[in-house]
């Protein structure tokens, strides 16, 4: 069965970036894979790691519906080239922008906050900027995880590329799990229902 959705979690590749604020989107993909009992694998010629799986309404507390076939994806490019991988995979799988979900960090939301939206600008986020450029549209769904702004005069780039302190990791883990719930809700129940439930 052809996939009906593509979900990408933005982040930078390699262990150097594991646990950073900028990689929280990729952490959500890892959580969705864990729930599905799946692992990402390199996709030949597409500069991405991905897995095709099925999501159902089992964990959402809503009536059962037909499971949806989705591609869960993490780019193997750096953040500012995310659009290269997204456009390749979307084109290959026949996914249109309205069935693309991009999960990413958002400095204009406080830590722990979650916001779902469709369309809009890139707000200086280089991953979103690259995806918009390569798809030639910003008309895709975003799951935005708040990481907050840096204190004082710290460079925002240094802030998002820093690892989350140990004392905040539990809170971040809760946020990642909630964002994974939100992705499942968008796919099974639709964006409006998911926004009503998860926007904070």
Curated annotation (Swiss-Prot):
User: Mind telling me which Pfam families this protein's record contains?
Assistant: Pept_tRNA_hydro
Under which EC number(s) is this enzyme classified? 3.1.1.29
Annotated site residues (Stabilizes the basic form of H active site to accept a proton) in this chain: 105
Q: Where does tRNA bind?
A: 17, 78, 80, 126
> What is this enzyme's class at the first EC digit?
hydrolase
Task: Output the PROSITE patterns linked to this UniProt entry.
Answer: PEPT_TRNA_HYDROL_2
Tell me where it resides.
Cytoplasm
Which keywords describe this protein according to UniProt? Cytoplasm, Hydrolase, RNA-binding, tRNA-binding
Catalyses: an N-acyl-L-alpha-aminoacyl-tRNA + H2O = an N-acyl-L-amino acid + a tRNA + H(+)
- This protein's GO CC annotations: cytoplasm
Q: Where is this site: Discriminates between blocked and unblocked aminoacyl-tRNA?
A: 12
**Where, by residue number, is the active site?**
22 (proton acceptor)
GO MF entry, a single one? tRNA binding
Q: What does this protein do?
A: Hydrolyzes ribosome-free peptidyl-tRNAs (with 1 or more amino acids incorporated), which drop off the ribosome during protein synthesis, or as a result of ribosome stalling.
PANTHER family reported in the protein's UniProt record: PEPTIDYL-TRNA HYDROLASE
What NCBIfam families has UniProt attached to this entry? pth (TIGR00447)
- Indicate what this protein is called per its UniProt record: Peptidyl-tRNA hydrolase
The species this protein belongs to is Cutibacterium acnes (strain DSM 16379 / KPA171202)
The gene name reads: pth
């Amino acid at each position: 069965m052809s996939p009906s959705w593509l979900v990408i979690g933005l982040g930078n590749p390699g262990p150097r970036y594991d646990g950073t604020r900028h990689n929280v989107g990729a952490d959500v993909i890892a959580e969705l894979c864990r729930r599905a009992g799946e692992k990402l694998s390199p996709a030949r010629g597409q500069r991405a790691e991905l897995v095709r799986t099925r999501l159902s309404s089992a964990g959402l507390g809503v009536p059962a519906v037909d499971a949806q076939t989705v591609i869960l994806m993490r780019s193997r490019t750096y953040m500012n080239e995310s659009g290269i991988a997204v456009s390749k995979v979307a084109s290959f799988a026949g996914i249109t922008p309205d069935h693309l979900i991009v999960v990413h960090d958002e400095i204009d939301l406080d830590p722990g906050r979650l916001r779902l939206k469709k369309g809009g600008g890139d707000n200086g986020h280089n991953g979103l900027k690259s995806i918009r450029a390569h798809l030639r549209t910003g008309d895709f769904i975003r799951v935005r995880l708040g990481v907050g702004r840096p204190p004082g005069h710290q460079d925002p780039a240094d802030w998002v590329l820093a690892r989350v302190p140990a004392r905040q990791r539990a809170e971040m883990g809760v946020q990642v799990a909630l964002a994974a719930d939100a992705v499942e809700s968008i796919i099974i129940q639709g964006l409006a229902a998911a926004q009503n439930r998860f926007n904070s």
